Amino acid sequence: MLKLLLGDPNARKLKRYQPIVSDINLLEEEVSPLSDDDLRRRTAEFRQRLDNAGSLDQQRPVLDELLPEAFAVVREAGKRVLGMRHFDVQLIGGMVLHEGQIAEMKTGEGKTLVATLPSFLNALTGRGVHVVTVNDYLARRDAEWMGQVHRFLGLSVGLIQQDMTPAERRRNYGCDITYATNSELGFDYLRDNMAADINEVVQREFQYCVIDEVDSILIDEARTPLIISGQVERPQEKYQKAAEVAAALTRAAEMGKDGIDPEGDYEVDEKQRSCTLTDEGFAKAEQMIGVADLYDPQDPWAHYITNALKAKDLFTRDVNYIVRDGEAVIVDEFTGRVMPGRRWSDGQHQAIEAKEALAIQPETQTLASITYQNFFLLYPRLAGMTGTAKTEETEFEKTYKLETTIVPTNRVRARQDWVDQVYKTEEAKWRAVAKETAEVHQQGRPVLVGTTSVEKSELLSALLAEEDIPHNLLNAKPENVEREAEIVAQAGRSGAVTIATNMAGRGTDIILGGNSDYMARLKLREVLLSRLVRPEEGHRPPVPLQRSGAEGGGGFAAKAAPASGPHGHAPSEARAIGSLYPCQLTEDTDQALADLAKDLVKAWGDRALTVIELEDHIATAAEKAPTDDPAIAALRAAIARVKGEYDDVVKQEEQRVREAGGLHVIGTERHESRRVDNQLRGRAGRQGDPGSTRFFLSLGDNLLRIFGGDRVAGLMNAFRVEEDMPIESGMLTRSLEGAQKKVETYYYDIRKQVFEYDEVMNNQRKAVYSERRRVLEGRELKKQVVGYGERTMNEIVEAYVNPDLPPEEWDVTQLVSKVQEFVYLLDDLQADQLQGLSMDELKAFLQEQLRNAYDLKEGQIEDQRPGLMREAERFFILQQIDTLWREHLQSMDALRESVGLRGYGQKDPLIEYKNEGYDMFLDMMTNMRRNVIYSMFMFQPAPPAGQSAGQRTTA
C-alpha cells in the first residue's frame, strides 16, 4: 500500500542521481580535449581544494561538490587507459558507493570499473581508501587492471598479498588506494594490535572502504571470527582414542523425542550441526576408554568424543575438506575454494586429522580475535557492491546501517529461467542433468553446471565421460584450481561444458565465443614458460597443448581420447578434452613468438624468472598503460597480434553461440541461501546476452531433507511416479522457497547472536587496543603509569578504610604494609603519619608519596642509561596488557559457553554475559594497573657490564 502511495523508494533514489549524471555528461565535453598532463593536473587541483577544508567531516561536503568533476575525469582516464567508458548506470553505481551504501549490480555490469569512481574521489583526501575483494587473485587483478586508471591520474596504488613482509605491507597501506582481501585486512589489524613496537604497525587510520562481493564477506563469512592463535600442548592420544570410540559407536536412525533417548549410541542434529550421546552411548564410551566419568574435570573426555562424532558424521571428506599433502584443508562452503592455513577451532580440526589418520597438529589458544562485522564497522564510511543483495537487505540495514540500492542494468536482460525439475531420487536427478547437458551441448551452446561439492562434481564428470561428452572440471582439487582462469576463459565457447563447484566470487566473466584476450595471454605464457622460468620452480604448463584434431575449427573436439577403462575413459582424461586455442597461429606469428622468446631471454635472462614474475610481466603487457620498457612493449605487440588472429575465429563463434541461445546454466541443488542460487543464474545472460538457466533437484537433497520437514516427506510418499519422471508442483516449489527462507532466517539469527555477543567483546577490545596504541606511540608514558599508581593507592584506601567507622578504628597499619608491598621505596612510611587524616586526605597524601617515590625510582634507572625508564614503562604495560587480555579472552569464551544454560533459570543469557563480562573486564584492567606499578618499582636493571636481566614480577 505504501509503495502505491509513495512510489518505489529505489526508483525515487535513482531519480535523485539523474541530474548529477547529466552534469557529468556535460563535463565530458570539457574534459575530453584535455591533454594527459592537464588531466593529471586536475587531481592536484582537487587535492588542493580538499586540503583547504581541514578535518574529514569538513571535507565531506567538498567531496560531494567535487563528485561530478572527479567522476568526469575518471571516466576520461578509463577511456584513455583501459579503452572502457563508464556507462551512465555505472556512474549511478559510483554515487551509491560514495554515499556509503550497497549497490546491487547484476553480473557482467562492470562492478570492478564502478569501484574506480568512489575510490578515486575518496582517495583525494590523502587518508587512504581500501578496495576489498574475496581472494588474492582478484585483489592482484584489480590492482593491476583498474590501478592503471588511478596511476594515470597521479595517485599511488598499493596491493596486499598473503606472503608480503611487514615493510612491504606498510608501504602498500601508505598508498592512496590499497587493494586487499578481507582476511589480510583483518589479520593485519589484529597483528598491529599485538605489535611490540610502533614501527611494526603497518596500517594507518581507516577512512573509506569499498567491498566487492559484499554479501559474501559481510554475510556468508560473518559467522566465522578472525583468530590469531598461539599453540598449546594437548595430549594427541586422546584425539586418536576418541576417533576409535566414535567409529565403534552407532548413530541413531532418528532424533529422540520428549526427553526419551532413541535407539542407538548417539543422535545427530544436522540442522544445529551437533552430536549428543545417549545414556547407552555414555556407558559404552566410558567402558571403552576405561574411565568412570567422561566429564571428570581432572581427566575430561566428553569434548574429545563430541568432536570425534562431529568429524565422523558432520564433516565429510571432499565436501567440507579435502586431504592434500597429508593435511586436512578446509573447503569454503560458499565459493568451493580451498582455504590453506585456516583451521577449525576447539579441537575440531584435530578430531578430523585423527579420523583421517593424519599427523595431528597442536591445538591453539586465542591471542586476538575479531568478527568481520565489527572489523568493517571500524570504517567511518563503508560501501559495497554485489549482484545479489536485495534478499539480505534487512540484515545489511540492521547490522551495518547500510542501505541497498538496485542499480539498473545497461541493457535489457534476455535470460530465460526455466522451471525447476524435481526428481524422486538423487540418481535420477544426476541422469537428467547429464541428459540435458548432452542435449544443449549438441546444439552447440556452452553449458555451465554448478555443483555443491567436489564429490558431486566428480560424479557428474564420470557420467559425462560415459556419454563421451568433452568437459572441463573446476573444483577445489589443486590440479583444477591451477587451470581456473584458463577453464573460465573458454567456458563460453561453442559446445563447451564446464562443471564448477560454487561459482560465487570466481571473478571472471564467461564471454560467449571465448575470451580471446585471455587465450592470447595464455598462449604467450605457454611459449615463454620453458625459456624464461627457472627449472626448479617445478612448473608444468597449466594449459593442455594444442590438439591435432581441433585445429582451425574453433569449438571443442567432438571425440574423446582413445578408450581406457569401462566407461571409455577416466574422468581425469575427460576434463582436458578440447583445444584451448580457437585456431592454429600462422607460421609468421609462430616465428615472431620464437624471436620474441630469444629477445626476452637477452633482456630478462635464460630461465631466470619465477612463474609469478613471468605472469606479472604478461599482465603488465596486457594493460594499456604507457610503458618505457622495450621488452614489455614487444610483449604487448605480440599479445595484440595473437589476439587479432584468435578474434577472427572467436567473433564468428560468438555469433553462432548467440544464435544457438547463449550460455545455459544448470544448478544441481538449491543452496541454503537464495542468493547463491541467484549468483549462479547470473552467470548466464550477462549484459543483455541470450541465455537460460534451470535447477534440477531431488527429494533427497540436503535442503529438503533437513529443513523441508514432514510436508516434503509426505509428498515423497504421495508421488507414486516413476523415478526418472520430473515432478513439477506449485506446492513443492513453495515448500522449497519456504525451506530456503527458513534457513536464511535461521542463519541470520545465528549471525545476529554472534554479533550481539561480539559487541560486548568489541567495546572491551576497543578500550584495550586504544590504551595499547597510546603506549606504543609513547605518548605521556610516565603520566600514564603514575595514573595507574594513583588509582592503585585509592583502591588500597577503599579496601582498608570503612568511612562509616570513626577514624581511630581504621586499620591504618595494614593499609601501610599493603602500600609498601607495591612501593618498596616507601619503607620509611609510618602508620602515625596517617593518623587524623580524612579518607580524601589519606588518598591525596598517598598519591603524593607515590609520585615522590616514582621520581626517585626514575632517577635511579635513568642513571644507568638515559631513556631506560620510558622503555621499561612501555615493556611492562604491553606485557601486562597482552598477558591479561589473552587470559581474559579465554575466560570470556568459557563464560559464553556456560551462560547459555541460564536461560533455563528464566534469565536472559545475553544480559548475564554483558554484566559478568563487564565485571571481568574491570577486574582485568585493575590487575593490569596493579601489576604494572608493582613491576615498575621492582625493576632492577642489570649494571652496564650486565649479566642478568631485570626482575619482571607480577603481583
UniProtKB/Swiss-Prot annotation:
Comp. bias regions, Low complexity: 557-571
Gene3D superfamilies noted in UniProt: Helical scaffold and wing domains of SecA (1.10.3060.10), P-loop containing nucleotide triphosphate hydrolases (3.40.50.300), SecA, preprotein cross-linking domain (3.90.1440.10)
Keyword terms, alphabetized: ATP-binding, Cell inner membrane, Cell membrane, Cytoplasm, Membrane, Nucleotide-binding, Protein transport, Thylakoid, Translocase, Translocation, Transport
E.C. number: 7.4.2.8
Catalyzed chemical reaction(s): ATP + H2O + cellular proteinSide 1 = ADP + phosphate + cellular proteinSide 2
Record: residues binding ATP: Q90, G108, E109, G110, K111, T112, D509
Renumbered residue ranges of the record's region Disordered: 537-571
Gene Ontology biological process terms from the UniProt entry: intracellular protein transmembrane transport; protein import; protein targeting; protein transport by the Sec complex
Gene Ontology, cellular component aspect: cell envelope Sec protein transport complex; cytosol; plasma membrane-derived thylakoid membrane
Gene Ontology molecular function: ATP binding; protein-exporting ATPase activity
Domain of life (superkingdom): Bacteria
Membrane disposition: Peripheral membrane protein
Coiled coil residues, start to end: none
Localization, UniProt: Cell inner membrane; Cellular thylakoid membrane; Cytoplasm
Subunit architecture: Monomer and homodimer. Part of the essential Sec protein translocation apparatus which comprises SecA, SecYEG and auxiliary proteins SecDF. Other proteins may also be involved.
The family this protein is said to belong to: Belongs to the SecA family.
Chain's role: Part of the Sec protein translocase complex. Interacts with the SecYEG preprotein conducting channel. Has a central role in coupling the hydrolysis of ATP to the transfer of proteins into and across the cell membrane, serving as an ATP-driven molecular motor driving the stepwise translocation of polypeptide chains across the membrane. Probably participates in protein translocation into and across both the cytoplasmic and thylakoid membranes in cyanobacterial cells.
HAMAP family: SecA
Protein name: Protein translocase subunit SecA
Organism in which the protein naturally occurs: Synechococcus sp. (strain WH7803)
Lineage: Bacteria, Bacillati, Cyanobacteriota, Cyanophyceae, Synechococcales
GN (gene name): secA
